[in-house]
Amino acid sequence: MTELLSPAGGREALVAAVQNGADAVYMGFGSFNARRSARNFSDEEFLAAVRYCHLRGVKVYLTLNTLVTDRELPALAETARRASEYGVDAILVQDWGVYETLRAVIPDVPLHASTQMALHTLSGVEEAARLGMTRAVLARELSGGELREIAERAPIEIETFAHGALCMCYSGMCEMSAVIGGRSGNRGACAQPCRLRYGWHGKADANPLSLKDANLAAYAGEMAEMGVACLKLEGRMKRPEYVAAVTGIYAALLREHRAPTADEQKKLALAFSRDGFTDGYYRGRRGKEMFGVRPETARWPEEWFGTLRAAYEKEDMRLVPVRFRAALRLGEPMVLTAEDGDGHCVTVTGAAPEAARSRAVTAGEVEARLRKTGGTAFTVSDCAVTAENGLSVPASALNALRRDALAALETLRTEIPERREGTFVPAERIKNPTEPPRFTASIYRAGQLTDALVNEGVETVYVPLELLPSVEVEKYRGRTKFAAVLPRVWRTADEEGLREQLRTAKERGVECAVLGNLGHFALVRGLDMELRGDFGLNVFNSAALRFLKEQGLSGATLSFELRHEQLRDISKCIPCEAIVYGRLPLMITENCIVANEFGCRHFKGRCDAACADSACAAAPELTDRVGERFPVLHAYGCRSELQNGKTLWLADKPEYRKIGLTYARLRFTTESAEECVRVLRAYKGREEYTPKDITRGLFYRGVE
């Protein structure tokens, strides 16, 4: 049966989830999770929570799905070790350094690929399986058909979000909160700037980045039928009563194999919505109708929530059925066998019955006494008593027999498995290169690559794979290297075409492929190209670099969320690169921001055109409340990539030359060909030039 996974942002929410039918809960422990402001659990609370859940047949998943620095890794390893010791069933991860660490420290604990890994293709899931992960949480942006295609062919379990908040950006790829305010969504501190007002033509008069919550209740049965192993409910930041309401409805739908009633849909909306719900991604219908905000007048339904709260606080609705078999014989210890539905079975003995001097106990009276399980997590579903005639048994002896049996059964159900433990070993310290970095350049338009740029000296030119047919690779061979940048987001159906494009690129002299997602490793396998990691791999620590080296990468771009000291201190087992110039990418979105506002004649659910004659060719600018303008660029598959309004500029800052980088990347997006050359000349100290509206990015301030 498909598992229902509910959020547990605190003890009360955990009880609400379990009592209303959750098969599993996900929760935080310590500070390393994607909802740091949720009420996470202390050691004592976490152990008690695991026991509470396991007693009732509910699994517990720990969220360690954030990016972690080298200094934080030892504490994370210890957190994971204690969670394993307390019996956690699986751990969700995003950071490849965390993955490496957990495989070494707690090798027997199952790992799940978090949605923060941005897995959205069969190839990505297959790569997660190759690495030993047992489950992949897919991106929310997939359609029902795409979900089915993956679920039916996946070698590991598939989990998908069924209800709750939708981020505008693909999870794990959003930098908006980090770049604008220093609060990283990749470290559990997202400030949700996407919920604010933005607009066009200099006005912030709408909410074009605020999606309604997803509601896939109508498709719960369909997803179960297609082989989805787990339906996940979002909401670790929401009230426990919300968790109770949504869990209860989805549990009933899965248990009873039916569609939601109109009343249930009304209750889901009453619990929480942003001006209604959306199923747009699941149905493959992107567009403006998917967007909404929570009205300022919205209030929690306190009366209904009070009823829900009273139910899960005062009554254990999640009792474990047990079968009793009792045998009473004169002069022999009483025997009681208790068995649950999960294969646990115990047998206990009690005081020996004596011959009755007056009234003898009956089998029915023994059964009635054994069925009194109040105050426990058990209920007797069946009780068979075999008793000789003429016996006397004190009620206290029967009570003790029942208590002993249930205590023994509880011990079995909450038993913590024996697991191996390893030792955390920090990455080997490798001395930083002392030479200044060589410059690479990524381009967005073919016209940005010119003789003048190449003549100034660019070690490698990064070109989007889909742009390569328009680039004169042959003209510049021998004067610079070319690297094909794979799309940040694609679909399983695109993969053969992408492989063919890579083969063609290699034949033309493109030597290198740039990977930004786990699924890319499958796309390039067997092509014998040099492989470099892009910023999308979110390299935040030395262990992540070590992992990427083991996967065959010859270089990697470090996360631009890192401060220069953190960039310096990473142990560079392979050549490292950092973005030192350009508009930093804030979001990549499945919904085309431009098409939603201006329309697009190519926009028919998906688009193979380059959008050269559409609105997004001009890089329209989204405006925020303070007048900052954010260019929106076209991305592969008719998606949008939102850029920062200010340009990262470090040409006048010598620190980036002294932190062990092999390459320094100039990221060109909206620049003219002439501007590209001037930027490169400025970074090489050959021209006095500074663009307008610059920022130092996160190079000095870093992120929370």
Per-segment meaning from a language model:
Residues M1-N20, A24-A34, L47-V50, R56-S84, ...:
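Surface-exposed amphipathic alpha-helical tracts and adjacent flexible/coil segments at the periphery
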Residues A34-N40:
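Short glycine-enriched, charge-decorated loop/helix-capping segments at active-site entrances
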Residues M117-T121:
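Conserved phosphate-binding/catalytic loop of the ribokinase/pfkB sugar-kinase fold
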Residues F41-F46:
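Glycine-rich, highly charged phosphate/nucleotide-binding loops
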